[in-house]
Amino acid sequence: MMLWKFPVRYDVIVIGGGHAGCEAALASARMGLRTLLLTMNLDTIAKMSCNPAVGGIAKGHIVREIDALGGEMGKVIDVTGIQYRMLNATKGPAVWAPRAQADKLAYQSEMKHRMERVSNLDIKQGTIEDLLIENDHICGVITKEGISYDCQAIVLSSGTFLRGLLHIGETNYSGGRAGDQPSVGMSASLEKYGLKLGRLKTGTPPRINKRSIDFSCTEEQPGDPGVKFSYDNEGIPRLPQVSCYITYTTEETKQIILSNIHRSPMYSGKIKGVGPRYCPSIEDKVVRFSDKERHQIFLEPEGLQTQEVYVNGVSSSLPFDVQLAFIKSIPALRHAEIMRPAYAIEYDYVISGQIDFSLECKKIGGLFLAGQINGTSGYEEAAGQGLMAGINAANKVMGKAPLILKRSEAYIGVMIDDLVTKGLDEPYRMFTSRAEHRLLLRQDNADLRLRRYGYEVGLVDQTRYDRVKEKQRIMEEESERLAKTFKQVSNKGYTLTQLLCRPENTYASLLKEYPDVMQNFGEEINFQIELNLKYAGYIDRQTSEVAKLAHVEKIQIPIGFDFSTVNGLRNEAKQKLNQIAPRHLGQALRISGVSPADISILMIALTRYQEPIEKERLTSDCSEA
């Protein structure tokens, strides 16, 4: 094939225009690097291929962290959402999670519009056929259209497109998702350069016509007021808000599915990829939970300008006639019209152990991976990885150290640490239970935790950084003042802190009761002061646990350290440690197959390894003196 060389040499090329690719491209360009986003179709940038929603349990935390670091997802959903809710609001604050129903076409359009306005960012349509690599380092790409682009780093965020195969009953065909072609050349290129690929599976439910739903048989679910994702979107106008609706499957639904289970490619053996355990298809639900009488379904509008409704809870790969039959077995959907059928999709991903904590490939320098190619599922998980990959690709080009978030700092840090240190046997989904220090990683304090990093890499401007520093100052000073200010209650003196910590009291109620001594800093700051004081004991305990682990995290492991030379380490530990190459002892401790006894042996070995290096350094210093 004759190639035409594009005359501009880019610093960073981002492959794929999904949620990971958007964040990666924006981060790299805003950090001052000449960036190119290459995607197969400019009309599908930021497309919501599955559910029309952003956020949810743990996922909402990630979106707020993306925003705190200077990313875009939270800002876009705040202006394109058609319903907002705070999930788990009746539980403890560690698991409260914002979720928004999106107008998915508005979301796509808004994200694309924002990207097109960013200087340093070029957006072009093209399908990647091959990577250009010299001396084990990325140097460019070749497209199907016969164009070669040179660069210094690449972020690959291919979603479900790598050798994608769609399944609807006995029918299957190649595709990246419904209506889009797959990427075949990229998979072959990755294998050619030594990366090991596996297969995963995900699925999506049918979309039905809103006019065909009997809403009298459903339970209305309105949104919650005051929920937002971005720390910078105060007072912005919002789209008209709508409700979602709840309904349930029936015994008839169950029998229809069970009598046709042999026609499901999941159960006939046609699908080889592993699906997400925590987002099962309706086939899996009726088989695995056979004692359950019914399963909950959420009817979610896909936008203000469409009649399509997403039937959340019935992801399926059954044939269309079976889909139609089980949908019509639900009372609210007796007359339902399916506008788009459900389907399952298999796709390639890079098997665990081949990227480091910066998301850079170990075998190919300058190649960063983000999103479903790393084995994750979900828009939010992809966007979080995309942001970090974009930051670290830019840092590599500029000769700077990568930004690596700790598990105690962010859910994004937990996710990436898990992806690197733990093997995946199914699509990875973030849960609050994966984080050891959930009370420190609340959705409300992401700006206090992470905005500094966004400022340091150049994604957060001085004004926004000053705002969070001022917020921190107010919270600290007010907490001290509340602990020193007394009020008489039933002839007994109590500090305002003591009164606030009573279960029946809130910051808002004390503002009304004691307006002479309570100060109003706005709902957000008032709320955080209240949480920090009410949960002070638990927060202090988790902070202490983090401090205890810090000394293990500080014991660095030299780059290129050969674990096979350490006497006493079990063979499994040697293999896993050499494969993953942890940067410090804390990461080594979390690797599956590495025991506490292995860590003790490794700690001694590292001490001995460092002794001659330290002695040589001291000798050198003395000679120079």
UniProtKB/Swiss-Prot annotation:
It is found in: Cytoplasm. Transmembrane segments: none annotated. FAD binds at residues 16-21, 128, 183, 372. Pfam families: GIDA (PF01134), GIDA_C_1st (PF21680), SAM_GIDA_C (PF13932). One of its GO terms (biological process) is tRNA methylation. It comes from the Bacteria. PROSITE patterns: GIDA_1 (PS01280), GIDA_2 (PS01281). GO terms for molecular function: flavin adenine dinucleotide binding. Its cofactor is FAD. GO terms for cellular component: cytosol. Its main location: cytoplasm. Gene3D superfamilies: FAD/NAD(P)-binding domain, GidA associated domain, C-terminal subdomain, tRNA uridine 5-carboxymethylaminomethyl modification enzyme MnmG/GidA. InterPro entries: FAD/NAD-bd_sf, GIDA_C_N, MnmG, MnmG-rel, MnmG-rel_CS, MnmG_C, MnmG_C_subdom, MnmG_C_subdom_sf. NAD(+) binds at residues 275-289. Keywords: Cytoplasm, FAD, Flavoprotein, NAD, tRNA processing. NAD-binding protein involved in the addition of a carboxymethylaminomethyl (cmnm) group at the wobble position (U34) of certain tRNAs, forming tRNA-cmnm(5)s(2)U34. Belongs to the MnmG family. Homodimer. Heterotetramer of two MnmE and two MnmG subunits. This is tRNA uridine 5-carboxymethylaminomethyl modification enzyme MnmG. It comes from Protochlamydia amoebophila (strain UWE25).
